[in-house]
């Protein structure tokens, strides 16, 4: 029972709250964020394959607008855009709304990372479970997890970086050798963290 209640909560939390991410409308800056992503993607394709795709949207400060989250959400896009709840929309609207689910799934993942951080610090499984439930149900974070393609991904990756920092610190305190994989992980996720919110 010590862990069962947490996973029962998590199951219903994903099912029920996940639906709200589909029902949340598009905010005022999501189209801009999406267009910056498309232009940056075109820029990469132009560089790699000598193409001449449109990158005009990056004029001015647009190219410094972080797009790291979209690398992650692109993996889910082909599947999420086919959900029946999105069938009435055009393809671009489907893609933007599908990112809401990607944000929400990343938020749930951040909850699991949060639980691991608590266990690293306190080593009390029940306390970690309850803390994670309160974290996931915190109204401000939960509300933003339905649509915010900037702050929630940044928070989630920041927690992952924090987990690896604490893990490495604990190993060093115990005078043990830190495995190279931890440095690779924290380097990768720190780079991703900076790419999500470069400025603003």
Annotate each language-model stretch with its function:
Residues 7, 83-89, 109, 114-137, ...:
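Transmembrane-helix signature of polytopic, membrane-embedded enzymes
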Residues 15-19, 31-69, 75-88:
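Extracytosolic helix-loop segments that constitute the early lumenal/periplasmic catalytic or substrate-binding loops
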Residues 27-28, 146-154:
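Short acidic/glycine- and proline-prone juxtamembrane loop motifs at membrane-interface regions
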Residues 33-35, 39, 107, 154-162:
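Hydrophobic core segments of transmembrane alpha-helices in multi-pass, intramembrane catalytic enzymes
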Residues 71-102, 124, 139-140:
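Juxtamembrane segments of multi-pass membrane glycosylation machinery
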Residues 97-122, 160-164:
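Transmembrane-helix motifs of polytopic, lipid-linked glycan transferases
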Residues 131-136, 143, 163, 190, ...:
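Short helix- or helix-capping micro-motifs
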Residues 161-182:
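Membrane-interface transmembrane helices that cradle and orient dolichyl/undecaprenyl
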């Amino acid at each position: 029972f010590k862990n069962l209640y947490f996973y029962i909560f998590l199951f219903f939390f994903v099912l029920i709250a996940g639906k709200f991410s589909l029902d949340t409308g598009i905010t005022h800056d999501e189209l801009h964020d999406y267009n910056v992503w498309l232009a940056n993607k075109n820029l990469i394709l132009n560089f790699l394959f000598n193409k001449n795709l449109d990158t005009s949207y990056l004029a001015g400060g647009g190219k410094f607008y972080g797009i790291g989250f979209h690398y992650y959400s692109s993996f889910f896009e082909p599947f999420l855009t086919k959900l029946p709840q999105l069938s009435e929309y055009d393809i671009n609207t489907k893609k933007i709304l599908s990112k809401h689910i990607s944000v929400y799934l990343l938020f749930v993942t951040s909850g699991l990372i949060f639980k691991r951080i608590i266990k690293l610090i306190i080593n009390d499984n029940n306390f970690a479970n309850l803390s994670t439930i309160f974290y996931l149900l915190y109204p401000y974070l939960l509300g933003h997890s339905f649509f915010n393609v900037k702050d929630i991904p940044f928070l989630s990756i920041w927690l992952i970086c924090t987990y690896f920092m604490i893990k490495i610190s604990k190993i060093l305190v115990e005078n043990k050798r830190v495995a190279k994989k931890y440095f690779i992980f924290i380097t990768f996720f720190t780079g991703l963290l900076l790419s999500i919110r470069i400025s603003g």
